[in-house]
Amino acid sequence: MTTATTVKTEYEAIIGLETHCQLSTKTKIFSNSSTAFGADPNTNIDPVCMGLPGVLPVLNEKVLEYAVKTGLALNCQIARYSKFDRKQYFYPDLPKNYQISQYDLPIAEHGWLEIELVDAEGNPSRKRIGITRLHMEEDAGKLVHAGSDRLSGSSYSLVDYNRAGIPLVEIVSEPDLRSGLEAAEYAEELRRIVRYLGVSDGNMQEGSLRCDVNISVRPVGRKEFGTKVEIKNMNSFSAIQRAIDYEIERQIAAIEAGDRIIQETRLWEEGAQRTSSMRVKEGSSDYRYFPEPDLAPIEVSNEQLENWRSELPELPAQKRHHYESELGLSAYDARVLTEDRSIAEYFETAIASGANPKAAANWITQDIAAHLNKQKLTITQIELTPTNLAEIITRIETGKISNAQAKEKLPDLLSGISPEKAFAGLELITDPTVLEPIVDEVIAANPKELEKYRNGNTNLKGFFVGQVLKKTAKRADPKLTNELVEKKLNA
Protein backbone atom coordinates (compact mmCIF):
# COMPACT_ATOMS: atom_id res chain seq x y z
CA MET A 1 0.00 0.00 0.00
CA THR A 2 1.19 3.52 -0.71
CA THR A 3 2.66 5.33 2.25
CA ALA A 4 1.58 8.83 3.19
CA THR A 5 3.69 11.92 2.62
CA THR A 6 5.13 13.18 5.91
CA VAL A 7 3.29 16.25 7.23
CA LYS A 8 5.06 18.76 9.48
CA THR A 9 4.26 17.69 13.01
CA GLU A 10 3.20 21.14 14.24
CA TYR A 11 0.17 21.05 11.93
CA GLU A 12 -2.64 18.60 11.37
CA ALA A 13 -4.98 18.20 8.42
CA ILE A 14 -8.76 18.07 8.84
CA ILE A 15 -10.29 16.20 5.90
CA GLY A 16 -13.79 15.20 4.87
CA LEU A 17 -15.04 13.62 1.65
CA GLU A 18 -18.21 14.19 -0.34
CA THR A 19 -18.71 11.15 -2.56
CA HIS A 20 -21.20 11.02 -5.42
CA CYS A 21 -22.08 7.45 -6.31
CA GLN A 22 -24.15 6.65 -9.41
CA LEU A 23 -26.70 3.93 -8.72
CA SER A 24 -26.91 0.96 -11.09
CA THR A 25 -30.58 1.26 -11.95
CA LYS A 26 -31.68 0.56 -15.52
CA THR A 27 -33.57 3.84 -15.78
CA LYS A 28 -33.10 7.36 -14.46
CA ILE A 29 -34.26 8.62 -11.09
CA PHE A 30 -37.39 10.45 -12.26
CA SER A 31 -37.99 9.11 -15.80
CA ASN A 32 -37.74 6.00 -17.99
CA SER A 33 -34.64 6.95 -20.00
CA SER A 34 -31.77 4.47 -19.99
CA THR A 35 -28.76 4.96 -17.74
CA ALA A 36 -26.43 2.95 -20.02
CA PHE A 37 -22.91 4.38 -20.20
CA GLY A 38 -21.26 5.14 -23.54
CA ALA A 39 -24.35 5.93 -25.65
CA ASP A 40 -24.09 8.58 -28.37
CA PRO A 41 -24.43 12.10 -26.93
CA ASN A 42 -27.97 13.24 -26.15
CA THR A 43 -29.66 9.94 -27.04
CA ASN A 44 -30.62 8.80 -23.51
CA ILE A 45 -32.80 11.82 -22.82
CA ASP A 46 -36.49 12.62 -22.39
CA PRO A 47 -38.75 15.59 -21.54
CA VAL A 48 -38.37 15.01 -17.77
CA CYS A 49 -34.58 15.05 -17.54
CA MET A 50 -34.48 17.93 -20.06
CA GLY A 51 -36.84 19.97 -17.90
CA LEU A 52 -39.38 20.66 -20.63
CA PRO A 53 -42.56 22.53 -19.58
CA GLY A 54 -45.51 20.53 -18.33
CA VAL A 55 -43.71 17.31 -17.35
CA LEU A 56 -43.65 15.84 -13.84
CA PRO A 57 -41.01 13.65 -12.17
CA VAL A 58 -41.89 10.22 -10.73
CA LEU A 59 -39.45 8.62 -8.26
CA ASN A 60 -37.85 5.35 -9.37
CA GLU A 61 -38.58 3.02 -6.42
CA LYS A 62 -35.32 1.13 -7.02
CA VAL A 63 -33.41 4.31 -6.21
CA LEU A 64 -35.03 4.47 -2.78
CA GLU A 65 -34.23 0.80 -2.16
CA TYR A 66 -30.57 1.22 -3.16
CA ALA A 67 -30.21 4.39 -1.08
CA VAL A 68 -31.66 2.75 2.03
CA LYS A 69 -29.49 -0.36 1.59
CA THR A 70 -26.40 1.81 1.28
CA GLY A 71 -27.41 3.74 4.38
CA LEU A 72 -27.90 0.51 6.32
CA ALA A 73 -24.51 -0.82 5.18
CA LEU A 74 -22.96 2.42 6.44
CA ASN A 75 -24.61 1.98 9.86
CA CYS A 76 -26.82 5.03 9.31
CA GLN A 77 -30.13 5.93 10.88
CA ILE A 78 -32.76 5.66 8.14
CA ALA A 79 -35.33 8.44 8.02
CA ARG A 80 -38.86 7.08 8.02
CA TYR A 81 -39.94 10.41 6.53
CA SER A 82 -37.87 12.49 4.12
CA LYS A 83 -38.39 14.73 1.11
CA PHE A 84 -36.78 16.14 -2.01
CA ASP A 85 -35.70 19.75 -2.44
CA ARG A 86 -34.74 22.03 -5.30
CA LYS A 87 -31.11 23.12 -5.32
CA GLN A 88 -30.99 26.11 -7.61
CA TYR A 89 -28.02 27.21 -9.65
CA PHE A 90 -27.42 28.20 -13.24
CA TYR A 91 -24.98 26.22 -15.36
CA PRO A 92 -25.22 24.81 -18.91
CA ASP A 93 -25.22 21.17 -17.74
CA LEU A 94 -28.38 21.73 -15.66
CA PRO A 95 -31.31 22.04 -18.09
CA LYS A 96 -33.96 22.93 -15.46
CA ASN A 97 -31.68 25.49 -13.75
CA TYR A 98 -32.23 23.52 -10.56
CA GLN A 99 -31.23 20.08 -9.32
CA ILE A 100 -33.64 17.82 -7.44
CA SER A 101 -31.74 16.82 -4.29
CA GLN A 102 -32.33 16.46 -0.54
CA TYR A 103 -31.45 19.19 1.93
CA ASP A 104 -32.69 19.22 5.52
CA LEU A 105 -34.32 15.77 5.63
CA PRO A 106 -31.91 13.29 4.00
CA ILE A 107 -32.81 9.63 3.68
CA ALA A 108 -29.96 8.55 6.01
CA GLU A 109 -27.59 10.15 8.52
CA HIS A 110 -25.36 9.58 11.58
CA GLY A 111 -23.49 6.52 10.30
CA TRP A 112 -19.92 5.29 10.12
CA LEU A 113 -17.56 2.98 8.30
CA GLU A 114 -14.30 1.45 9.44
CA ILE A 115 -11.11 1.77 7.45
CA GLU A 116 -8.14 -0.55 7.81
CA LEU A 117 -4.54 0.48 7.24
CA VAL A 118 -1.78 -2.14 7.05
CA ASP A 119 1.79 -1.21 8.01
CA ALA A 120 5.00 -2.43 6.38
CA GLU A 121 5.05 -5.50 8.66
CA GLY A 122 1.51 -6.45 7.68
CA ASN A 123 -0.07 -5.38 10.97
CA PRO A 124 -3.55 -3.87 10.56
CA SER A 125 -4.87 -0.83 12.41
CA ARG A 126 -8.49 0.27 12.23
CA LYS A 127 -10.20 3.64 12.45
CA ARG A 128 -13.89 4.53 12.45
CA ILE A 129 -14.89 7.37 10.12
CA GLY A 130 -18.22 9.08 10.75
CA ILE A 131 -20.83 9.49 8.02
CA THR A 132 -22.73 12.77 8.39
CA ARG A 133 -25.46 12.02 5.88
CA LEU A 134 -26.49 10.18 2.73
CA HIS A 135 -29.02 11.71 0.38
CA MET A 136 -30.53 11.03 -3.04
CA GLU A 137 -30.28 13.38 -5.99
CA GLU A 138 -30.17 13.52 -9.77
CA ASP A 139 -26.93 13.90 -11.71
CA ALA A 140 -26.29 16.82 -14.05
CA GLY A 141 -25.25 16.64 -17.69
CA LYS A 142 -21.64 16.57 -18.82
CA LEU A 143 -19.75 19.47 -20.38
CA VAL A 144 -17.11 18.72 -23.00
CA HIS A 145 -14.70 21.61 -23.50
CA ALA A 146 -13.03 21.80 -26.91
CA GLY A 147 -9.30 22.37 -26.73
CA SER A 148 -9.07 22.08 -22.93
CA ASP A 149 -10.10 19.88 -20.01
CA ARG A 150 -11.86 22.85 -18.38
CA LEU A 151 -13.90 25.90 -19.38
CA SER A 152 -10.92 28.23 -19.12
CA GLY A 153 -8.85 27.93 -22.29
CA SER A 154 -11.48 26.15 -24.38
CA SER A 155 -12.71 27.55 -27.69
CA TYR A 156 -16.25 26.29 -27.12
CA SER A 157 -18.16 23.76 -24.99
CA LEU A 158 -20.63 20.99 -25.81
CA VAL A 159 -23.23 19.52 -23.46
CA ASP A 160 -24.20 15.85 -23.27
CA TYR A 161 -27.43 15.40 -21.30
CA ASN A 162 -27.28 11.60 -21.22
CA ARG A 163 -26.03 11.84 -17.64
CA ALA A 164 -28.74 14.30 -16.55
CA GLY A 165 -31.19 12.51 -14.29
CA ILE A 166 -29.02 9.49 -13.52
CA PRO A 167 -29.63 8.60 -9.85
CA LEU A 168 -26.97 9.46 -7.29
CA VAL A 169 -26.43 9.08 -3.62
CA GLU A 170 -24.16 11.67 -2.08
CA ILE A 171 -22.31 10.38 0.98
CA VAL A 172 -20.79 13.04 3.23
CA SER A 173 -18.18 12.02 5.78
CA GLU A 174 -17.38 13.68 9.07
CA PRO A 175 -14.03 15.55 9.09
CA ASP A 176 -12.39 12.54 10.74
CA LEU A 177 -9.67 11.89 8.15
CA ARG A 178 -6.15 13.14 8.79
CA SER A 179 -4.09 12.19 5.72
CA GLY A 180 -4.26 11.44 2.03
CA LEU A 181 -3.69 7.78 2.81
CA GLU A 182 -6.68 7.62 5.16
CA ALA A 183 -8.89 9.44 2.65
CA ALA A 184 -7.92 7.11 -0.20
CA GLU A 185 -8.62 4.06 1.98
CA TYR A 186 -11.99 5.53 3.02
CA ALA A 187 -12.95 5.99 -0.65
CA GLU A 188 -11.78 2.46 -1.50
CA GLU A 189 -13.77 0.94 1.36
CA LEU A 190 -16.83 2.90 0.26
CA ARG A 191 -16.46 1.49 -3.24
CA ARG A 192 -16.08 -2.05 -1.88
CA ILE A 193 -19.32 -1.64 0.04
CA VAL A 194 -21.44 -0.34 -2.87
CA ARG A 195 -20.03 -3.07 -5.11
CA TYR A 196 -20.83 -5.78 -2.56
CA LEU A 197 -24.35 -4.40 -2.30
CA GLY A 198 -24.68 -4.39 -6.09
CA VAL A 199 -26.02 -0.82 -6.04
CA SER A 200 -23.16 0.67 -8.10
CA ASP A 201 -20.20 -0.46 -10.16
CA GLY A 202 -18.05 2.24 -8.50
CA ASN A 203 -16.12 2.86 -11.72
CA MET A 204 -14.15 6.08 -11.22
CA GLN A 205 -12.99 6.23 -14.85
CA GLU A 206 -16.61 6.31 -16.04
CA GLY A 207 -17.66 8.76 -13.34
CA SER A 208 -19.75 6.28 -11.35
CA LEU A 209 -17.81 7.26 -8.21
CA ARG A 210 -16.66 10.86 -7.83
CA CYS A 211 -15.00 12.25 -4.72
CA ASP A 212 -14.67 15.88 -3.70
CA VAL A 213 -12.29 16.60 -0.83
CA ASN A 214 -12.75 19.29 1.82
CA ILE A 215 -9.50 20.06 3.59
CA SER A 216 -8.06 22.54 6.04
CA VAL A 217 -4.98 22.58 8.25
CA ARG A 218 -4.50 23.91 11.76
CA PRO A 219 -1.78 23.91 14.40
CA VAL A 220 -1.82 20.78 16.52
CA GLY A 221 -3.82 21.40 19.69
CA ARG A 222 -6.08 24.10 18.27
CA LYS A 223 -9.79 23.20 18.33
CA GLU A 224 -11.01 25.70 15.74
CA PHE A 225 -11.00 24.56 12.12
CA GLY A 226 -8.93 26.37 9.54
CA THR A 227 -10.38 27.75 6.29
CA LYS A 228 -11.81 24.92 4.21
CA VAL A 229 -10.76 24.35 0.61
CA GLU A 230 -12.56 21.96 -1.75
CA ILE A 231 -10.63 19.88 -4.29
CA LYS A 232 -12.22 18.35 -7.40
CA ASN A 233 -11.18 16.36 -10.49
CA MET A 234 -9.56 13.27 -8.95
CA ASN A 235 -10.29 10.13 -10.97
CA SER A 236 -8.37 7.50 -8.99
CA PHE A 237 -7.65 6.63 -5.38
CA SER A 238 -3.97 7.42 -5.81
CA ALA A 239 -4.95 10.83 -7.23
CA ILE A 240 -7.04 11.48 -4.10
CA GLN A 241 -4.03 10.74 -1.92
CA ARG A 242 -1.62 12.82 -4.01
CA ALA A 243 -4.00 15.78 -4.26
CA ILE A 244 -4.52 15.85 -0.50
CA ASP A 245 -0.83 15.49 0.28
CA TYR A 246 -0.05 18.37 -2.09
CA GLU A 247 -2.81 20.59 -0.69
CA ILE A 248 -1.70 19.99 2.90
CA GLU A 249 1.80 21.18 2.05
CA ARG A 250 0.45 24.14 0.04
CA GLN A 251 -1.71 25.35 2.91
CA ILE A 252 1.04 24.90 5.48
CA ALA A 253 3.46 26.86 3.30
CA ALA A 254 0.89 29.63 2.85
CA ILE A 255 0.22 29.87 6.60
CA GLU A 256 3.92 30.00 7.41
CA ALA A 257 4.42 32.71 4.78
CA GLY A 258 1.67 34.79 6.38
CA ASP A 259 -0.74 34.38 3.45
CA ARG A 260 -4.48 34.03 3.95
CA ILE A 261 -6.19 30.77 2.96
CA ILE A 262 -9.40 31.61 1.10
CA GLN A 263 -12.47 29.39 0.93
CA GLU A 264 -12.45 28.20 -2.66
CA THR A 265 -12.78 25.25 -4.99
CA ARG A 266 -9.50 24.04 -6.48
CA LEU A 267 -8.87 21.66 -9.35
CA TRP A 268 -6.40 18.78 -9.18
CA GLU A 269 -4.15 18.88 -12.26
CA GLU A 270 -2.90 15.34 -12.81
CA GLY A 271 -0.21 16.30 -15.31
CA ALA A 272 1.27 19.07 -13.18
CA GLN A 273 0.63 17.21 -9.90
CA ARG A 274 -0.79 20.30 -8.22
CA THR A 275 -4.05 22.03 -7.35
CA SER A 276 -5.11 25.30 -8.99
CA SER A 277 -7.88 27.76 -8.15
CA MET A 278 -11.16 27.09 -9.94
CA ARG A 279 -13.73 29.38 -8.27
CA VAL A 280 -14.61 30.99 -4.96
CA LYS A 281 -16.54 28.45 -2.90
CA GLU A 282 -20.28 29.02 -2.52
CA GLY A 283 -22.19 28.39 0.70
CA SER A 284 -25.41 26.41 0.95
CA SER A 285 -27.48 29.62 1.17
CA ASP A 286 -26.45 30.49 -2.39
CA TYR A 287 -28.52 27.56 -3.69
CA ARG A 288 -31.88 28.85 -2.35
CA TYR A 289 -33.17 25.39 -1.37
CA PHE A 290 -36.90 24.85 -1.02
CA PRO A 291 -39.09 21.70 -0.96
CA GLU A 292 -39.69 20.08 -4.35
CA PRO A 293 -43.39 20.76 -5.07
CA ASP A 294 -43.74 18.09 -7.79
CA LEU A 295 -42.74 15.11 -5.61
CA ALA A 296 -44.57 13.72 -2.60
CA PRO A 297 -42.68 13.20 0.67
CA ILE A 298 -40.94 9.83 1.04
CA GLU A 299 -42.09 7.37 3.67
CA VAL A 300 -40.16 4.17 4.45
CA SER A 301 -42.33 1.54 6.13
CA ASN A 302 -41.14 -0.93 8.76
CA GLU A 303 -41.77 -3.76 6.30
CA GLN A 304 -39.66 -2.14 3.58
CA LEU A 305 -36.85 -1.41 6.01
CA GLU A 306 -36.69 -4.94 7.39
CA ASN A 307 -36.96 -6.54 3.94
CA TRP A 308 -34.08 -4.46 2.63
CA ARG A 309 -32.03 -5.09 5.77
CA SER A 310 -32.51 -8.86 5.37
CA GLU A 311 -31.15 -8.68 1.82
CA LEU A 312 -27.81 -7.14 2.83
CA PRO A 313 -24.81 -9.40 2.15
CA GLU A 314 -21.90 -9.92 4.51
CA LEU A 315 -19.80 -6.82 3.92
CA PRO A 316 -16.02 -6.57 3.33
CA ALA A 317 -15.11 -5.55 6.89
CA GLN A 318 -17.15 -8.44 8.32
CA LYS A 319 -15.48 -10.89 5.95
CA ARG A 320 -11.99 -9.61 6.78
CA HIS A 321 -12.65 -10.07 10.50
CA HIS A 322 -14.02 -13.58 9.88
CA TYR A 323 -11.08 -14.60 7.69
CA GLU A 324 -8.49 -13.34 10.18
CA SER A 325 -10.04 -14.41 13.49
CA GLU A 326 -11.70 -17.69 12.49
CA LEU A 327 -9.74 -18.92 9.46
CA GLY A 328 -6.32 -17.72 10.62
CA LEU A 329 -5.48 -15.74 7.48
CA SER A 330 -3.10 -12.80 7.46
CA ALA A 331 -4.47 -9.27 7.24
CA TYR A 332 -2.98 -9.01 3.75
CA ASP A 333 -4.64 -12.18 2.45
CA ALA A 334 -7.96 -11.23 4.02
CA ARG A 335 -7.79 -7.85 2.33
CA VAL A 336 -6.98 -9.25 -1.11
CA LEU A 337 -9.69 -11.90 -0.89
CA THR A 338 -12.37 -9.40 0.10
CA GLU A 339 -11.44 -6.75 -2.47
CA ASP A 340 -14.09 -8.14 -4.79
CA ARG A 341 -17.24 -9.99 -3.77
CA SER A 342 -16.84 -12.62 -6.51
CA ILE A 343 -13.33 -13.47 -5.27
CA ALA A 344 -14.58 -13.80 -1.68
CA GLU A 345 -17.43 -16.06 -2.83
CA TYR A 346 -15.00 -18.19 -4.87
CA PHE A 347 -12.76 -18.59 -1.81
CA GLU A 348 -15.67 -19.46 0.47
CA THR A 349 -17.01 -22.04 -1.97
CA ALA A 350 -13.56 -23.64 -2.17
CA ILE A 351 -13.25 -24.03 1.62
CA ALA A 352 -16.86 -25.23 1.83
CA SER A 353 -15.78 -27.94 -0.65
CA GLY A 354 -13.04 -29.07 1.72
CA ALA A 355 -10.05 -26.88 0.85
CA ASN A 356 -7.61 -25.85 3.57
CA PRO A 357 -8.31 -22.08 4.00
CA LYS A 358 -4.65 -21.00 4.01
CA ALA A 359 -3.82 -23.15 0.98
CA ALA A 360 -6.88 -21.85 -0.89
CA ALA A 361 -5.92 -18.27 -0.02
CA ASN A 362 -2.38 -18.84 -1.34
CA TRP A 363 -3.61 -20.28 -4.63
CA ILE A 364 -6.16 -17.52 -5.19
CA THR A 365 -3.99 -14.55 -4.18
CA GLN A 366 -0.86 -15.79 -5.96
CA ASP A 367 -1.11 -18.19 -8.91
CA ILE A 368 -4.72 -17.55 -9.89
CA ALA A 369 -4.40 -13.78 -9.33
CA ALA A 370 -1.29 -13.69 -11.54
CA HIS A 371 -3.24 -15.42 -14.33
CA LEU A 372 -6.18 -13.02 -13.94
CA ASN A 373 -3.91 -9.97 -14.09
CA LYS A 374 -1.98 -11.24 -17.09
CA GLN A 375 -5.09 -12.17 -19.07
CA LYS A 376 -7.14 -9.19 -17.79
CA LEU A 377 -9.89 -11.52 -16.58
CA THR A 378 -12.15 -11.65 -13.56
CA ILE A 379 -12.41 -14.77 -11.42
CA THR A 380 -15.89 -15.45 -12.80
CA GLN A 381 -14.36 -15.87 -16.28
CA ILE A 382 -12.03 -18.78 -15.52
CA GLU A 383 -13.03 -22.41 -15.98
CA LEU A 384 -11.36 -23.68 -12.81
CA THR A 385 -14.25 -24.07 -10.40
CA PRO A 386 -13.73 -23.55 -6.65
CA THR A 387 -14.75 -27.18 -6.14
CA ASN A 388 -11.97 -28.34 -8.47
CA LEU A 389 -9.50 -26.04 -6.69
CA ALA A 390 -10.47 -27.74 -3.43
CA GLU A 391 -9.82 -31.13 -5.03
CA ILE A 392 -6.37 -30.02 -6.22
CA ILE A 393 -5.45 -28.82 -2.73
CA THR A 394 -6.69 -32.07 -1.20
CA ARG A 395 -4.61 -34.11 -3.68
CA ILE A 396 -1.51 -32.14 -2.68
CA GLU A 397 -2.14 -32.49 1.04
CA THR A 398 -2.81 -36.22 0.81
CA GLY A 399 0.39 -36.76 -1.16
CA LYS A 400 -1.23 -37.84 -4.42
CA ILE A 401 0.44 -35.03 -6.38
CA SER A 402 3.11 -32.48 -5.61
CA ASN A 403 2.72 -28.73 -5.45
CA ALA A 404 5.07 -28.46 -8.44
CA GLN A 405 2.89 -30.80 -10.49
CA ALA A 406 -0.19 -28.75 -9.67
CA LYS A 407 1.48 -25.49 -10.70
CA GLU A 408 2.72 -27.09 -13.93
CA LYS A 409 -0.81 -28.18 -14.83
CA LEU A 410 -2.46 -24.92 -13.75
CA PRO A 411 -2.90 -23.52 -17.30
CA ASP A 412 -4.79 -26.68 -18.28
CA LEU A 413 -6.88 -26.55 -15.12
CA LEU A 414 -7.74 -22.88 -15.68
CA SER A 415 -8.97 -23.71 -19.18
CA GLY A 416 -11.45 -26.23 -17.79
CA ILE A 417 -9.64 -29.58 -17.77
CA SER A 418 -10.72 -31.59 -14.74
CA PRO A 419 -8.21 -32.58 -12.04
CA GLU A 420 -8.85 -36.26 -12.86
CA LYS A 421 -7.79 -35.76 -16.46
CA ALA A 422 -4.98 -33.31 -15.73
CA PHE A 423 -3.29 -35.58 -13.19
CA ALA A 424 -4.04 -38.94 -14.81
CA GLY A 425 -0.93 -41.11 -14.55
CA LEU A 426 0.87 -38.51 -12.45
CA GLU A 427 0.18 -39.86 -8.98
CA LEU A 428 3.22 -39.53 -6.75
CA ILE A 429 5.39 -42.54 -6.02
CA THR A 430 5.11 -42.79 -2.25
CA ASP A 431 6.16 -46.43 -1.81
CA PRO A 432 9.76 -46.59 -0.49
CA THR A 433 10.23 -50.06 -1.97
CA VAL A 434 9.52 -48.63 -5.43
CA LEU A 435 11.54 -45.44 -5.01
CA GLU A 436 14.63 -46.86 -3.27
CA PRO A 437 15.95 -48.82 -6.31
CA ILE A 438 15.61 -45.67 -8.43
CA VAL A 439 17.66 -43.69 -5.91
CA ASP A 440 20.32 -46.43 -5.90
CA GLU A 441 20.44 -46.37 -9.70
CA VAL A 442 20.89 -42.57 -9.82
CA ILE A 443 23.70 -42.62 -7.24
CA ALA A 444 25.47 -45.47 -9.02
CA ALA A 445 25.29 -43.58 -12.31
CA ASN A 446 27.04 -40.51 -10.89
CA PRO A 447 30.19 -41.64 -9.05
CA LYS A 448 32.06 -38.33 -9.50
CA GLU A 449 29.25 -36.34 -7.92
CA LEU A 450 29.02 -38.91 -5.11
CA GLU A 451 32.73 -38.49 -4.38
CA LYS A 452 32.44 -34.69 -4.33
CA TYR A 453 29.48 -34.92 -1.97
CA ARG A 454 31.34 -37.16 0.44
CA ASN A 455 34.31 -34.79 0.29
CA GLY A 456 32.18 -31.99 1.69
CA ASN A 457 30.16 -30.57 -1.22
CA THR A 458 26.80 -31.28 0.42
CA ASN A 459 24.99 -28.93 -1.97
CA LEU A 460 25.11 -31.78 -4.49
CA LYS A 461 22.29 -33.43 -2.61
CA GLY A 462 19.95 -31.27 -4.70
CA PHE A 463 21.54 -32.66 -7.86
CA PHE A 464 20.71 -36.25 -6.88
CA VAL A 465 17.16 -35.33 -5.85
CA GLY A 466 16.70 -33.59 -9.20
CA GLN A 467 17.95 -36.65 -11.09
CA VAL A 468 15.46 -38.87 -9.26
CA LEU A 469 12.62 -36.48 -10.07
CA LYS A 470 13.74 -36.36 -13.69
CA LYS A 471 13.92 -40.13 -13.94
CA THR A 472 10.39 -40.48 -12.52
CA ALA A 473 8.92 -37.61 -14.59
CA LYS A 474 8.48 -35.66 -11.32
CA ARG A 475 6.30 -38.39 -9.87
CA ALA A 476 8.64 -39.17 -6.98
CA ASP A 477 7.33 -37.86 -3.69
CA PRO A 478 9.68 -34.90 -2.94
CA LYS A 479 9.77 -35.45 0.83
CA LEU A 480 10.42 -39.18 0.56
CA THR A 481 12.99 -38.61 -2.18
CA ASN A 482 14.93 -36.18 0.01
CA GLU A 483 14.93 -38.63 2.90
CA LEU A 484 16.11 -41.59 0.80
CA VAL A 485 18.78 -39.60 -1.05
CA GLU A 486 20.23 -38.25 2.20
CA LYS A 487 20.20 -41.70 3.76
CA LYS A 488 21.97 -43.30 0.78
CA LEU A 489 24.53 -40.53 0.34
CA ASN A 490 25.55 -40.73 3.99
CA ALA A 491 25.57 -44.52 4.18
UniProtKB/Swiss-Prot annotation:
Catalytic activity entry: L-glutamyl-tRNA(Gln) + L-glutamine + ATP + H2O = L-glutaminyl-tRNA(Gln) + L-glutamate + ADP + phosphate + H(+); L-aspartyl-tRNA(Asn) + L-glutamine + ATP + H2O = L-asparaginyl-tRNA(Asn) + L-glutamate + ADP + phosphate + 2 H(+)
Enzyme Commission code(s) on record: 6.3.5.-
Entry-linked SUPFAM superfamilies: GatB/YqeY motif, Glutamine synthetase/guanido kinase
Keyword Electron transport tagged: no
Entry keywords, A to Z: ATP-binding, Ligase, Nucleotide-binding, Protein biosynthesis
MF term (GO), any: asparaginyl-tRNA synthase (glutamine-hydrolyzing) activity
Keyword Repressor in record: no
Single biological process term from Gene Ontology: translation
Highest taxon, organism lineage: Bacteria
Alphabetical list of PANTHER family matching this protein: GLUTAMYL-TRNA GLN AMIDOTRANSFERASE SUBUNIT B MITOCHONDRIAL AND PROKARYOTIC PET112-RELATED, GLUTAMYL-TRNA(GLN) AMIDOTRANSFERASE SUBUNIT B, MITOCHONDRIAL
UniProt-listed NCBIfam families: gatB, PRK05477.1-2, PRK05477.1-4
HAMAP family: GatB (MF_00121)
Subunit structure: Heterotrimer of A, B and C subunits.
Main function: Allows the formation of correctly charged Asn-tRNA(Asn) or Gln-tRNA(Gln) through the transamidation of misacylated Asp-tRNA(Asn) or Glu-tRNA(Gln) in organisms which lack either or both of asparaginyl-tRNA or glutaminyl-tRNA synthetases. The reaction takes place in the presence of glutamine and ATP through an activated phospho-Asp-tRNA(Asn) or phospho-Glu-tRNA(Gln).
Family of this protein: Belongs to the GatB/GatE family. GatB subfamily.
Annotated protein name in UniProt: Aspartyl/glutamyl-tRNA(Asn/Gln) amidotransferase subunit B
Organism of origin: Nostoc punctiforme (strain ATCC 29133 / PCC 73102)
Gene name linked to the record: gatB
